Amino acid sequence: MSQKRVSVHALSATVVATLLAVGLTAGLPSPAQAAGTTYFISAAGSDSNSGTSSSTPWKSLAKINATVLKPGDTVSLRRGDTWTGGVVTGQSGTAAAPITLNSYGSGSAPTVTGGKSGNCIRINGDYTIVDGLRGVSCGYAGISITGDHDTVRNSSASNNAVGIKAGSGSDFGKYTGNVLTNNSIMNVLTRGTNCGTAQAVNCNDDSGASGVLINGNDNEFSGNTISGSNAFSYDYARDGSSFEIYNGNRNNIHHNVAVDNNNFSEIGRSTGTADGNTYRYNLVRATCGANCTQAKGLIARGPGTSFGPTNGTVFEFNTVYLNGSQSQAVVCHASCPSSTVIRGNILVGVKNSLWINGSGWTERQNVLNGPVNVVLNSTSTTAPARFLNAPSDLHLTGSSPAIDRAGTSPTAFDLAGVAVPQDGDCNGTAAADSGAYEFDSPNC
């Protein structure tokens, strides 16, 4: 990779191409599906048209919202067009014949703005695919999913409180190849009173600025690029997250790129649970100056807070690079659960590379650059990570202590599509590297 700064969009294209090439998007519905009716929508169309060909498209989103879609049906929006309002579907497809929302023609992605009840695209049914659409300035969420087994891919959202929402009860979804940019609006932003006292009011209620908000279970997020989820907060000074998990379980977050967000992922719960969430081969970088001063990578919790515990969190083979004066790469507080695993990462933070309390958790095979508050496992190191050209290129050099440090990996490819493991130190035995990138030595 070039040592010049790589743009967020270039990173996104690279990651998606890699995932497709190496088959890490397994589980996505096949392009081949049972035939149904295709409905065409164009800003230049007419609702008196048949809507069933690109030469006779409908015009309004209301027309499609009133249509009873059946398994195998497709709604195709013309590229280059913009609609104000919202797309809402409530019918379900099947595994063999999903309902699909996509685009036709040439030009920029079809855009929905303004929102309907705060959401530009809302999918309430099961087995529905959203492919290549855009939600901008929607009021709340660019794309909101409440059904099961839904797919959102190759889509984008910006200037919302939430880019993509996997809502409560939205399970077994696939989210890949999406670009979520500057979703930095706070949907709750109130100045608290009597904060720090028993009479405190509105001192812990600010929320928003999420690239992805996950309230569902067993969803997969891969190949996405999230940037600019970072906003002012009365309660927290700054707020925002690439992947916010609240009452969501067993979600798999892997091979994503997160740039200049306030947090990479914060996990919490209220009356539900937030257990068994995993993170692998993600690149997290926050170097945006004042707005990234307090950036964090992962925030997990124990039972000593009303938002915890977050049991069974696994965070491994990630590269986190934060340079703000109060930045912390991984935090697990309030008696961090013993089921937490922090393994095989490169963690760079100025205030803390790792802050963790409680007992019984697993920390090993990490490269940590920045203060830590615990005695590290003997398999971890605080030696400089030795990146190729930090912060713009966080691949490893041949002298990095991350090479061959992590033993085995459950994943066959790194963030760039390099096979794992490689014999990076040329000692005759291949082993996985710590961090999101595997070093493939040219010398052996």
Predicted regions: what is each one?
Residues 88-89, 114-121, 137-144, 159-170, ...:
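Extracellular beta-strand/beta-solenoid scaffold signature
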Residues 85-86, 104, 115, 136-139, ...:
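Surface-exposed loop/turn segments connecting beta-strands in extracellular beta-rich domains
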Residues 43, 57-58, 74-82, 90-141, ...:
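Right-handed parallel beta-helix/beta-spiral solenoid domain characteristic of secreted/periplasmic
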Residues 376-441:
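C-terminal accessory segments
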